[in-house]
Amino acid sequence: ILGRGYNMEFKVIESAKDPLFNEALKLYDDKLDIGLDEDSKIFKRSLENNKTENDYAFIVGIENQTVVSLATAHYEATTNSAFLIYLIAKESPNHDERMSLTLEAIEKQLNLLSQEVHNRDINFIMLEVPKEPSTVDIDDKLRNALEYRRQFLFENQFEKQDDIDYIHPNQNQKETPQKVDLFIKANIELTKDIYGTSVKSNYILKYVFANGISREIIYPLLKEMNLR
């Protein structure tokens, strides 16, 4: 158990056999109306494949024996940075507090991994966020959800970075990559020469090793982002 919020406790999921794993996936499936969704098999693969299993943080927030939030992230040990993939909370009057406590809990877990390797906290966390939509693109519900996400990130010390023209990769050759925004929460002063290398390392860890996307797709995208 990582710790408790107001009436929330947090647990680390280390195996797909953990009963909380399926409960967390159900919450994930229910929230797929926003963000960059993935096949739920990738959660299992990230927990179990030898390239990512020791550096994958998967936590759930529990209230009254029910999973009400989840967060997943990859810790990139070489550059001492992390890639926050999902941060989700069940809708409720205290949704904002659940989100903040869950973010705090995943940061604690990532810092535990960092302390084991470097004896200090992580340098930064990165997170992909869909671009701000034009007024004609989407309905009000989704626009509000996207605006809320950005506001939440700003309130929790994330900053949108503009040095990298960031691209979310296509899973296969039939799909097309998407331009998205990259938000970063830094614990040290960052310049592009520091975080560019880290972003590249996180990108490869996540998309080549966890998602299993071909290097033939990933490396040209890194080149396009000037990260090769």
Task: State what each model feature region is.
Residues 50-51, 109-120:
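Alpha-helix termini
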Residues 85-87, 99-103, 140-143:
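"Short basic amphipathic alpha-helical interaction patches in structured regions
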Residues 94-114:
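Conserved acetyl-CoA-binding loop-helix of GNAT-fold acetyltransferases
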Residues 21, 25-91:
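A conserved beta-strand-loop-helix scaffold within acyl/acetyltransferase catalytic domains
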Residues 23-27, 101, 105, 148:
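Alpha-helical elements of Rossmann-like donor-binding domains used by nucleotide-donor carbohydrate transfer enzymes
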Residues 89-94, 135-138:
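Surface-exposed cleft-lining segments at the edges of enzyme active sites
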Residues 3-9, 13-16, 115-228:
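Terminal substrate-recognition subdomain of acyl/acetyltransferases
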Residues 1-33:
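Long, low-complexity, intrinsically disordered N-terminal extensions of eukaryotic proteins, enriched
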